[in-house]
Amino acid sequence: MPRVKRGVTARARHKKVLKLAKGYYGARSRTYRVAKQAVTKAGQYAYRDRRQKKRQFRQLWIARINAASRQNGLSYSRFINGLKKASIEIDRKILADIAVFDKVVFTTLVEKAKEALAK
């Protein structure tokens, strides 16, 4: 069986890692060993933060809805409960947009939630 020299595959793998590390500071973008660690860690951060991004946006939406509903005299939890009782199914992303950009419509939603809670 002939000897297999691994220069081609090793170079390809090194090039791939160094390409991913392009733009990193110092040896992280030039040295394979350090670049490999940096790329691996960057991948871990990216994986984690793709999940955290969803949580952070939901927190932001809830904070905006809470602020707007309190201006209309209702806490966030009571507002959401009122919407559910009034059979109004709008997700938090849309509610937050309405709260920021269309205060008249949001006030109407708060009034409907108050009516549903009073029943």
Curated annotation (Swiss-Prot):
Keywords: Ribonucleoprotein, Ribosomal protein, RNA-binding, rRNA-binding. It comes from the Bacteria. The keyword Phosphoprotein does not apply. GO terms for biological process: ribosomal large subunit assembly; translation. InterPro entries: Ribosomal_bL20, RIBOSOMAL_L20_CS, Ribosomal_protein_bL20_C. GO terms for cellular component: ribonucleoprotein complex; ribosome. One of its GO terms (molecular function) is structural constituent of ribosome. It holds the Pfam family Ribosomal_L20. Belongs to the bacterial ribosomal protein bL20 family. Binds directly to 23S ribosomal RNA and is necessary for the in vitro assembly process of the 50S ribosomal subunit. It is not involved in the protein synthesizing functions of that subunit. HAMAP family: Ribosomal_bL20 (MF_00382). This is Large ribosomal subunit protein bL20. It comes from Shewanella sediminis (strain HAW-EB3). The gene is rplT.
